[in-house]
């Protein structure tokens, strides 16, 4: 359990300086952070599934877009409980995942704009699909060589 705790907090086997320890310190215990991660993640999945179910109701495109986006935001925010918000933001905007992060955040915004203000149902669905793809690409950036494997797989299917 201790090794899992060190890996999730980013303290593999290195000693941190006092400033880094103060900035990364969390007032929540590891068990509390793990519980809130699970709660937030489950809520995110629930909202996404609820939004998908609402898609089939008359006029449900707007509700689908809102709940699907809220679900994805909650699932993304759940990792803040594991790493801490500052460390999560630093990792999100590292060079390897900067483009994926920007596209993902723009898809969140454009999905809500298309559904709530522009009233363009097709555009809202398109942005939800792009949201799913960008979140997948963002998530793959945390797995070593996963993006390369997906690119090779897709290129071999297309050629």
From Swiss-Prot:
Which keywords does this Swiss-Prot/TrEMBL entry list? Membrane, Phosphoprotein, Protein transport, Transmembrane, Transmembrane helix, Transport
Cytoplasmic topological intervals: 1-36, 84-97, 144-159
Is Ribosomal protein set as a keyword in this record? no
Q: Name one GO cellular component term.
A: membrane
Question: Can you tell me where the transmembrane regions are?
Answer: 37-57, 63-83, 98-118, 123-143
Subcellular localization is given as: Membrane
Where does the record place a coiled coil? none
- Answer whether the UniProt record assigns the keyword Cytoplasm to this protein: no
List all topological domains (Lumenal).
58-62, 119-122
Cited InterPro entries: Vesicle_transpt_Got1/SFT2 (IPR007305), Vesicle_transpt_SFT2 (IPR011691)
Pfam family for this entry, one: Got1
Q: List, in alphabetical order, the GO biological process terms annotated in this UniProt record.
A: protein transport; vesicle-mediated transport
User: Where are residues bearing Phosphoserine located in the sequence?
Assistant: 9
Query: What is the recorded membrane topology of this protein?
Result: Multi-pass membrane protein
Protein family membership: Belongs to the SFT2 family.
Q: What does this protein do?
A: May be involved in fusion of retrograde transport vesicles derived from an endocytic compartment with the Golgi complex.
Question: What is the protein's given name?
Answer: Vesicle transport protein SFT2A
């Amino acid at each position: 359990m201790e090794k899992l705790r060190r890996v999730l907090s980013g303290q593999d086997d290195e000693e941190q300086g006092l400033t880094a320890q103060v900035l990364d310190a969390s007032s929540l215990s590891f068990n509390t952070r793990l519980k809130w991660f699970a709660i937030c993640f489950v809520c995110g999945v629930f909202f996404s599934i609820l939004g998908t179910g609402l898609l089939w109701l008359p006029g449900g495109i707007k509700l689908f877009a809102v709940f699907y986006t809220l679900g994805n935001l909650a699932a993304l925010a759940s990792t803040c409980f594991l790493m801490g918000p500052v460390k999560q933001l630093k990792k999100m905007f590292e060079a390897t995942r900067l483009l994926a992060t920007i596209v993902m955040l723009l898809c969140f915004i454009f999905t809500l704009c298309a559904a709530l203000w522009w009233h363009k149902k097709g555009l809202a669905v398109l942005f939800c699909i792009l949201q799913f793809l960008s979140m997948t690409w963002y998530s793959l950036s945390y797995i070593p060589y996963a993006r390369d494997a997906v690119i090779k797989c897709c290129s071999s299917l297309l050629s």
